[in-house]
Amino acid sequence: MRIAIIGAGIAGLSAAYDLLRAGHTVTLLEGDNQTGGLATGFRDERWEWPLEKFYHHLFTSDRSIIGLVEEIGFRDKLFFPRPTTSVVYEDRIVPFDSPLRWITFPGFNLIDVARFGAVSAYLRFTKPWRELEKHTADSWLRRVYGDKIYETTWRPLLIGKFGPYYQEVNMAWMWARLHVRSPRLGYFEGGFQAFVDQLTEVVRGLGGDIRLNCPAERIAPDGRPDAGGLLVTAGGQTERFDAAVVTTSPALLARLTPDLAGDYLRQILALKSMGAVVMTLALKHSLMADSHTYWLNIPATSADKAGGVPFLALVEHTNYIDRRHYGDDHILYCGDYVTPDHPYFTMTQEELERLFVGVLHHFNPDFRPDWVRRSWLFRARYAQPVPGLNHSRAIPDLRTPIPGLYLASMSQVYPWDRGTNYAVEIGRKVAQLLLTDATSLSGRASAA
């Protein structure tokens, strides 16, 4: 079969890998100038390694991507440091990533520590999750952890992550995040871009046709009598394919496919998501040298973060990965999740840099703006799905109502959170589904 894959991110490349190995002809249509999607990197002229546009790491439990890494001969490039995760408490940076650190956390007494540890252990080791999706994370966490722990830890994180939707997110999503986390975090020699490049070359080596700067514009059934298949327009040209897999956002599928209608269309249009805005700073000095913090969760008290820190997380990458790979720069990400219509998507880089850099002295009183050697800004309007109550009923099927057309997006990996591991998983899952359907799809093509 001739198969088109819309999007050459991790999901698209993973699907292509399996489909090509099964003997099919695969064309990947990518609107960007490089493969990898949100896992792509960029490189300053001083650096040995490229850096992710949006911060990335793996957990030791990420079996899908680790399995693929092994298959393509890249396992020796994957390593797992043990960085420090901290929180801001009463204007101090406090490590908060192990039972010992929970005990010494100044906001908890011994009863709080026992309760926090017991509930967290339950979420970490329990497996059934469907009952949890009947409850919002806001209500469940408050009830089970108690008001004090909830207000100190979970509520600020939910607000920071989901903004105006924080009281809608179901508890199964939070369970999934806690269930798979590991203290050691995985990274690749050469960054995630090295993994993307390796997977891209494997796909090309199997015969995959990857077309960059070639955004998809329209997908429609071939309307000729007994023709079957799909007409895919990309880069101003229309080609016929036996099947197509869309690995971008559900909203883009709706725009690309005017023939999509009925319950499926209503289902994908009802899905909510948050965008991501990340400013990366190359600093002359470390911002969080005293605590050697990699990941700092910043408490948010309101969805608009008014009067507080204007982003969700500070990620000092070079407290995780040696800065010698980055020309001795200290790499700092300022990251936030915001609604797709948020002003951050229209503000200039200079405006956002003034806003973000203007609060960094709160985390290190010695910080001065002239520490910033260079900055970069990356934005994505579709980055974090918002799973509401009973979300499993709202997930679109991988098969769309249009024969031969499939959707494989981050909105369908629920209850798991978005990330490269689940991009690999859903990419390979949709490929196996398409292979299962191949007989009927090939039959239609033969009849034509």
Which role does the model predict for each range below?
Residues M1-L28:
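N-terminal Rossmann-like FAD-binding beta1-loop-alpha1 element of flavoenzymes
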Residues R46-E131, S139, R143:
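Dinucleotide-binding Rossmann-like beta1-alpha1 core, especially the glycine-rich loop
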Residues G7, F80-R82, L212-C214, A220, ...:
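Short loop/edge segments at beta-strand edges and connector loops
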Residues R92, T104, F108, G117-G229:
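Active-site/ligand-binding neighborhood in enzyme catalytic cores
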Residues A22, E217-L332, Y337-T346, E350, ...:
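Mid-domain catalytic core of redox enzymes
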Residues L20-E45:
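Glycine-rich FAD pyrophosphate-binding loop
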Residues A11, Q34, A251:
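Conserved Rossmann-like nucleotide-cofactor binding loop
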Residues L314-A448:
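Conserved flavin/dinucleotide-binding core of flavoenzymes
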